[in-house]
């Protein structure tokens, strides 16, 4: 009986050792990480997919894991011949995105709610929805084909550049933190800047403005508004609304550009208006095509 008991105990120990060995072997070969496969289904654009596979560490296994998603806060995919950023929605921790200089026609960033910086300039965008990106402080969407831009939900915006689009209007009344605004080369007929008290730099050249009121922009230090349609009393009002500059250096007031022909410059700034601007510390300037620089503008006779 004793021998039988000893044999049974030995068998139990052997089996136990086998179970332990099996468990140890399993722990040495964990299951593959769960995540998003970097494939054509999830990232249909071959250039975007190639960039992810070749330029980021997760390209080694072709899987975008949850840990990698949480650590990816910046993506720089500029000038990569990308036509679609489908798949960008998986990067939910993304804070900074540069996708400029590509061939992108549409951009869905509704899932990228942590974005603070977006450069999507020099693409072929006709629409841009940033209503879910309330944390954006910098939005650069220059050189596109946008006919409208709603930034009413982007109250944290400090820098907005929508240069060279097809905009006919732009509402920035909710963007009270704006410091720099560039809306050159659009078709905007009026702009309300009364709530933008922190604005320091304004580019609104080559639009269709007939009036411009800067009386609520006491921190303004730079104004570019050439090739609009501001003249006469409206030019008087514009100059009268410029904030007083009490520093030793003139602030730039780029008001005239005849480089595209005199007929394309709708602004008129007379000699007396030039003197009125200079009395407030602003130097009216015109573009010199020969010197390729901005020079002091003497003013027109009438």
What residues fall within each predicted segment?
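N-terminal capping/linker segments that flank leucine-rich repeat
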Residues: 4-6, 13-14, 19, 23-98, ...
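Conserved hydrophobic beta-strand positions in leucine-rich repeat
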Residues: 73-77, 97-99, 116-120, 137-141, ...
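Consensus "Asn ladder" position of solenoid repeat domains
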Residues: 80, 102, 123, 144, ...
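Canonical leucine-rich repeat
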Residues: 85-88, 107-109, 128, 149, ...
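Right-handed parallel beta-helix/beta-solenoid
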Residues: 109-113, 130-135, 151-156, 172-177, ...
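Eukaryotic tandem repeat interaction scaffolds
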Residues: 182-184, 196-210, 217
């Amino acid at each position: 009986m004793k021998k039988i008991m000893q044999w049974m105990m030995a068998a139990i120990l052997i089996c136990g050792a086998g179970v332990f060995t099996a468990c140890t072997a399993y722990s040495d070969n964990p299951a593959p990480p769960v995540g998003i496969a970097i494939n054509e289904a999830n990232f249909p654009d071959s250039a975007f997919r190639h960039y992810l596979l070749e330029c980021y560490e997760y390209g080694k296994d072709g899987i975008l894991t949850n840990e990698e998603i949480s650590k990816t806060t910046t993506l720089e995919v500029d000038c990569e011949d990308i036509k679609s950023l489908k798949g960008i929605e998986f990067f939910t921790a993304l804070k900074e995105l540069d996708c400029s200089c590509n061939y992108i026609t549409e951009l869905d960033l509704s899932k990228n709610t942590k974005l603070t910086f977006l450069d999507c300039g020099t693409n072929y965008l006709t629409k841009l929805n940033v209503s879910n990106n309330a944390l954006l402080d910098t939005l650069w969407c220059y050189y596109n084909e946008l006919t409208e831009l709603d930034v009413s939900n982007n109250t944290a915006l400090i820098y907005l550049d929508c240069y060279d689009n097809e905009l006919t209007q732009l509402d920035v009344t909710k963007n009270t933190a704006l410091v720099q605004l560039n809306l050159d080369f659009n078709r905007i007929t009026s702009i309300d800047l009364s709530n933008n008290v922190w604005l320091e730099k304004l580019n609104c050249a080559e639009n269709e403005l007939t009036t411009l009121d800067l009386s609520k922009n006491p921190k303004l230090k730079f104004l570019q508004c050439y090739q609009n349609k501001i003249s006469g009393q409206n030019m008087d009002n514009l100059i009268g609304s410029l904030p007083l500059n009490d520093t030793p250096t003139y602030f730039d007031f780029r008001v005239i550009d005849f480089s595209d022909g005199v007929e394309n410059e709708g602004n008129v700034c007379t000699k007396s208006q030039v003197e009125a601007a200079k009395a407030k510390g602003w130097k009216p300037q015109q573009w010199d095509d020969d010197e390729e620089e901005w020079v002091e503008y003497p003013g027109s006779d009438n």
